[in-house]
Amino acid sequence: MINAVRKNSSLLLFLIFISAILYSCAILNRWIVTDLGLLSYNRLWQLNISYTDFGFFRRGLVGTLLSESRINSLFSNEYFSALFIHAISIFIMTSLIAYYCFRKNIKNFLFVIGIAFSPALIIHQGYNTGNLDIFILIISIINIFFVRNYIIFSLLLFIGVLIHEIFIFTLPAQFFAFYLYNRSNKLKILDVATIIPVITSLSAIVIILFFGKLDISELEFKDVMQNKLPNAYMKHILWSGFYEVSTSGQLNLSLSTQYHFDHIKDGRFIYALLPLFYVGILILRATQNNHSRREVFFLVFAILFPLLIAFVAMDIYRWIAMSANMALLLTLKIVAKSGHTYSKWNILIAIFCLLAPFGAAGYARPFPMHQFVLEKFFF
C-alpha cells in the first residue's frame, strides 16, 4: 500500500513537471499565432556571437560554445536554431528541478504546483527569450541544489559571470545555499573553501570589467553579424548585439535609472506592484520556519538582490522574476533540509500560477499572455 502511494506521488510529480515543460514550450512557440511571427523570439546575437570572431568580450561564452559546436547552425534559419536551443534549455532546467524534488521526496501537491507553474520560473522562461537568463538559471540551480565541493562551486561561479554579468546578482543566493544549507560547509572567512570562491568570483568580475570590451568598430562588428544572422538582419533595433557588448556600465546606469523614474512619475510603475507582491509572498514562505535572525537577514538579502539589476537594465519583469526565482530555489533547498513542505502560503503561491508568465520588458505588459488573449479576441 505504501509503495503504491509512493509510486502514484512520483507519477504525479512527473506529470506536473512534464506539463510545465509543455506549457512553457507552447509559449516559446507563440510565433505560430502572433503577428510578429519568428520575431517574437526577440534577439539572436547572444547565441551566435563568438570569441573566434572578435576576441574575448563580455557575454560571449554561450555564443562561442554554440558556434564552435555548430549547435546554433542546426537549422538553415537561425530563428529555428534559437527555438530549438531554448526548448532544450527549458527541458534541462526543469529536469534539474524535478530530479531534486524527487530525490528529496518533495511531493506536496500545492507546493510543487507553485514551483512548476510559477509565473517567474519554468513558464516564464518560455516567454523570456532573446537573452541569456535561462543559462544563468541553469548554473544557479546546479550550484544551489547539487554542488558541495568548493572547487566545482567556484568553477561554476566563474563560468556564470562569463555568460552574463547579471549572474553576479545571483551570487548571494548561491553563497547562502552553499555555506548555510550544506552540512559539510561552514562559513569561515579565512577558510580556503570560502576564500577560493570569493576570489574566483572577483577575478571573473575584474576580467569582464578590464578585458571584456570590444576592440572593433561598430561597422566591422555588424558586417560579421550580418553574415551570421541573415534572417535577423535589421529586424530588431538591437539585432547585432553591438550595443549590449560595448556600452559602459555608467551609461546603462544613467539610462535605466531615468527610465524607471519616468515610469514612476507617469504611474506605470503600478503594473509592477502585483509581481512585486508575489516576491513578498515568496519571502514570507521562505522565512516562515527560520528562527535565526542572521539567516533570515541573509536569506531576504539574497532574494531581493537581483532587483538591483533594474539600476543597470530596463527589463523590470525579468529582474522581478530573477528575484522570485532565487526565492523559489532557496525555498526548495530549505524545505529539502527541514522537510516542511506544508505552508499556509502554498495556496496563495499556487493561485499566482494563474498569472504565468510574467513579462520581460515594458511596464505596461506585466502578464503578456493574458494581455495577448484579451487583445486578440476581445479588443
Tell where the protein language model's regions lie, with residue ranges:
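Aromatic- and kink-enriched transmembrane "portal" helix at the membrane-lumen/periplasm boundary
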Residues: G60, L110-I138
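Membrane-interface transmembrane helices that cradle and orient dolichyl/undecaprenyl
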Residues: I139-I152, S184, S338
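Membrane-water interface signatures at transmembrane helix termini and the short loops
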Residues: L121-L132, D266-Y271, Y278-V335
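Membrane-interface alpha helices of multi-pass inner-membrane proteins
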Residues: I151-F176, L307
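Short hydrophobic/aromatic helix or loop-helix immediately within or flanking a transmembrane segment
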Residues: D53-A87
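Transmembrane-helix motifs of polytopic, lipid-linked glycan transferases
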Residues: F84-K107, I142, L282-I283
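Transmembrane-helix signature of polytopic, membrane-embedded enzymes
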Residues: I97-P119, R293
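Perimembrane helix-loop-helix junctions
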Residues: L171-I199
